[in-house]
Amino acid sequence: MSQRLQSIKDHLVESAMGKGESKRKNSLLEKRPEDVVIVAANRSAIGKGFKGAFKDVNTDYLLYNFLNEFIGRFPEPLRADLNLIEEVACGNVLNVGAGATEHRAACLASGIPYSTPFVALNRQCSSGLTAVNDIANKIKVGQIDIGLALGVESMTNNYKNVNPLGMISSEELQKNREAKKCLIPMGITNENVAANFKISRKDQDEFAANSYQKAYKAKNEGLFEDEILPIKLPDGSICQSDEGPRPNVTAESLSSIRPAFIKDRGTTTAGNASQVSDGVAGVLLARRSVANQLNLPVLGRYIDFQTVGVPPEIMGVGPAYAIPKVLEATGLQVQDIDIFEINEAFAAQALYCIHKLGIDLNKVNPRGGAIALGHPLGCTGARQVATILRELKKDQIGVVSMCIGTGMGAAAIFIKE
């Protein structure tokens, strides 16, 4: 780890872990006309990659059918006049050009007018959350009053494309030590985190089993029903239930799974890593004053978003830097946060971030995370927003965060209303 990164880390972590409730918390709870608020946030079920309900459809189909359901549930003033939506941003990772053409087409087919501009975004695993930030920033600076953030991914149909996560063609870059680190497989970066920071296989399997147990319990209790919209498939069947969670998963049952990336001594397995998945999610945002004028419901409030860069070879540590940065930007501390939705790309990297920041495990992913639910890359950040707004209670504060391939981290803060 570079000296500069260590210095930044020390400053941010010390700031984030200060003692006592921050002075800024009460002021953040005050409602202002210029606030960016969330009017609606929903998602599809998450389908298992290559064999799940969405295996035979691609992202254009998923997005179009999701939008039909999502728009159909918009508050009447918006549903009656979609011209009020002034911008659409859609996160996606694996499609060529982040799906700029097919996802714009899906928006038009769903009734969003051609006069509403569209932008395709790809910041790898944070793409869905980056779309939320893109719309929020445009509202903040006065470019728009209402916007729609989306995230969609079909890992089934696009993950096996030639070089789906990019390539380096320049011979000069191929010889450059730092540049080559961007091509390190994600599983190997997680092995680096586990080895460098001494995250044991046992701890990883226990964390993963806990994720499965929480997700299966939440699914059985119907806690996801309010956030999941049904997707009608070409054969007429309906998918509206997550396919990843399963019963009777224990650390012991996971311990028998072989390492996936480093034979014999590796600790990363299919059981303690996120699932390859397909899914779509959407977040509708507005300026509070406009939402009030239109009598739109307010689920929560967007507060801030921050990203950081970290060494690509240990990219999973990203949230350990992004979370302190967004907390510092808002004057908050770790203990001010009621729930953390930290994407479980891998158990080792999630555990490192949780331990480094001194986060109470009971506050992390109370309904399970990507290990149990799945991680459709471009969808995940938007999905996490839909989830955390159901987990939080009135006036509680939540953080959504994830690591990002090639060495980054992102984090955002939301308040429930």
Swiss-Prot record:
Belongs to the thiolase-like superfamily. Thiolase family. Keywords: Acyltransferase, Fatty acid metabolism, Lipid metabolism, Mitochondrion, Peroxisome, Transferase, Transit peptide. This is 3-ketoacyl-CoA thiolase, peroxisomal. Its EC number is 2.3.1.16. SUPFAM superfamilies: Thiolase-like (SSF53901). One of its GO terms (cellular component) is peroxisome. Residues 1-15 are annotated as: PTS2-type peroxisomal targeting signal. Homodimer. Interacts (via PTS2-type peroxisomal targeting signal region) with PEX7; leading to its translocation into peroxisomes. It is found in: Peroxisome; Mitochondrion intermembrane space. The lineage of its organism: Eukaryota, Fungi, Dikarya, Ascomycota, Saccharomycotina.
